[in-house]
């Protein structure tokens, strides 16, 4: 998916005004303005013309998107904004902006890769959409799940509904010493919190080979095998989550099996 930033930068490189580009694409200047602000996404037909007219390569030789990374923040943010703007997702749409602001300047581990932290909640939310999960509260909680833990914002102070606050509070690990068993037992009482935690774990497990030391990776595998089957069982008990439960179970188990085979 082409992003507003790509359109704007390529248009300026070509020396085109928004009005001039609009004429070439056969749309209004207002449409171009909205595309560049990621307020709306162009149709597939218009997107293809934008790539051609602006000279933006869709794929690099190695198959990654033209900015060098498949799971790019700009692409994911534009995709989510487009989906949420056209559906009943007021909290999730607000959470998209809020999470980006709060995680500004933070990086995902390992720091050497220079991946903005917001990549993590964005990937999780795209994962949810890919599994057919289109619940406003759940999507907002996915975007906000690390805001309390990593940005110092108390869950009860988040400018969102009580249900979203409760989920974020449940998945936030206390700063002080705590019982891991009690932490997961509390999460297991809330199916949406279970879903947030399982999607989070799936994303974390997928990147632990490059982000964790060997000992930390072993501990993470053991923690996952100990506590996550129960969370997945809770998710499976919710009819609308049944397919997602199967997918997450398959994905997490496959990743763990692969991780165990990595020489350490």
Q: Language-model features: where?
A:
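Short basic helix-loop element that most often maps to the first helix and adjoining turn
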Residues: 5-20, 24, 49
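Active-site helical microenvironments for divalent-metal-assisted chemistry
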Residues: 66-264
């Amino acid at each position: 998916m082409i992003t507003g930033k790509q359109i704007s930068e390529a248009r300026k490189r070509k020396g085109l005004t928004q009005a001039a580009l609009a004429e070439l694409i056969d749309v209004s200047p207002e449409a171009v303005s909205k595309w560049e602000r990621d307020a709306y996404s162009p149709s597939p037909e218009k997107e293809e013309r934008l790539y051609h007219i602006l000279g933006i390569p869709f794929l690099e030789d190695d198959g990654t998107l033209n900015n060098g990374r498949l799971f790019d923040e700009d692409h994911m943010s534009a995709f989510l904004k487009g989906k949420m703007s056209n559906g009943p997702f007021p909290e999730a749409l607000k959470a998209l902006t809020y999470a980006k602001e709060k995680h500004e300047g933070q990086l995902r581990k390992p720091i050497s890769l220079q991946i903005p932290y917001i990549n993590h909640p964005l990937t999780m939310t795209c994962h949810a959409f890919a599994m057919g999960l289109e619940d406003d509260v759940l999507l907002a909680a996915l975007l906000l799940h690390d805001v309390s833990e990593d940005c110092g914002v108390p869950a009860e102070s988040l400018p969102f509904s009580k249900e979203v606050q409760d989920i974020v509070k449940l998945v936030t690990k206390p700063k002080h010493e705590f019982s891991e068993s009690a932490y997961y037992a509390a999460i297991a009482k809330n199916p949406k919190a279970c879903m947030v935690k399982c999607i989070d774990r799936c994303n974390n497990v997928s990147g632990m080979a490059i982000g964790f030391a060997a000992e930390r990776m072993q501990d993470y595998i053991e923690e996952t095998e100990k506590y996550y089957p129960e969370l997945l069982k809770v998710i499976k008990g919710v009819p609308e989550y049944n397919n997602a439960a199967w997918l997450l179970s398959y994905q997490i188990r496959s990743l763990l099996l692969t991780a165990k085979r990595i020489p350490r």
